[in-house]
Amino acid sequence: KRGFLDVIKHVGKAVGKAALNAVNDMVNKPEQQS
């Protein structure tokens, strides 16, 4: 059985990675995504 905190950590890491990717996309291609 997985620990609840392990799940939270895993989800938090995935969300953080996705957020970083989104920010990088916005910075790299400023107004090409309308």
UniProtKB/Swiss-Prot annotation:
Query: Can the keyword Secreted be found in this entry's annotation?
Result: yes
The GO biological-process annotations, alphabetized, read as: defense response
Q: Where in the cell is it found?
A: Secreted
| TM spans (from-to) | none
Keywords carried by this UniProt record:
Amphibian defense peptide, Antimicrobial, Cleavage on pair of basic residues, Secreted
Pfam families annotated for this entry?
DD_K (PF12121)
Q: Is Ribosomal protein given among the entry's keywords? A: no
Q: In which tissues is it expressed?
A: Expressed by the skin glands.
Q: Which GO terms describe its cellular component?
A: extracellular region
Family that this chain belongs to? Belongs to the frog skin active peptide (FSAP) family. Cruzioseptin subfamily.
Cited function: Has antimicrobial activity.
Protein's UniProt name: Cruzioseptin-5
> What organism does the UniProt record list as the source?
Cruziohyla calcarifer
Q: What is the lineage of its organism?
A: Eukaryota, Metazoa, Chordata, Craniata, Vertebrata
